[in-house]
Amino acid sequence: MGKIYISQLFPEERVNKILNKYDIGLEIIEFGIGYTLDKDDNGIVEYYKRNGELIKNRSLSIHGPFLDLNTASFDNMIKQATLTRYNQAYSVAKRLGADRIVFHSCYYDDVYFKDVYINNSLEFWNEFLIDKDESINIHIENMYDKDLLVLKELVDKINSNIISICLDIGHANCYSNQSLEEIIKLLGSRIGHLHLNNNDGKKDSHRGFNSGNIDVIETLELIDKYCNNPSMTIEVSDFKEAEESISIIMKRNNK
């Protein structure tokens, strides 16, 4: 497996405890909300004041903005707002020295025909990537995607070596019509990053590895078999369950 990150889903003092205990990276979610990016210096100065020591010499991932945005929108003003926010978040990632940034797929199959979604999204991503170098990996994450074939086709058409898929296994468990095994076999080496958590298949509750109906270890074995060493973020909202999940990953990796 590749690099391991913990998502900053609980108070900073608890994140600090985990990062002091384990040699892992941090996925920052603070810049995923638009009003943070509206602050002076896109919120970086304020974040550094609180967390400068926490992130020093640490692998970082940024969760990009997602609320009210849409890469596939027919409305040019919405697409431009999305482009602005994505560029702001990318700039934050660059200045913090992040390894990667994660953006949602924005696919709603009850709204968009597949071909329309792919064409609109492709236009957006081609514009976004014009001035991006290879220093940051960009991952497109499944959210409400029912059929992951659509995301596969989009990534293939973008055809960039810095673009890959972030497979969120919790989202897939709740919203996809396909099993995780089918999805992993379908996407294969296109999976560059993982969001790992568990749920009951009904609500995206971000539970720990042992608190849901996903067999996380079996899923990771499929990842080992069909993918190319993706990085992963443990995206669990409960502190104790997050610690337990990290321990499970560490024990598995040390076998």
Language-model segments: residues:
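A short acidic, helix-capping loop that chelates divalent metal ions and anchors anionic groups
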Residues: 35-36, 68-73, 108-113, 174-175, ...
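Charged helix-capping and loop-helix junction motifs
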Residues: 41-47, 78-86, 115-125, 177-186, ...
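Acidic (Asp/Glu)-rich catalytic clusters
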Residues: 15-23, 41-62, 88-96, 129-133, ...
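Active-site acidic/histidine proton-transfer and metal-coordination neighborhood
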Residues: 72-164
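N-terminal pre-domain/capping segments
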Residues: 1-64, 68-88, 255
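Histidine-acidic metal/acid-base catalytic patches
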Residues: 2, 16-18, 148-156, 160-164, ...
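Active-site beta-loop-alpha junctions enriched in small/polar residues
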Residues: 7-11, 29-33, 65-67, 106-108, ...
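Hydrophobic faces of well-ordered beta-strands that scaffold small-molecule active sites
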Residues: 2-8, 24-28, 60-63, 101-103, ...
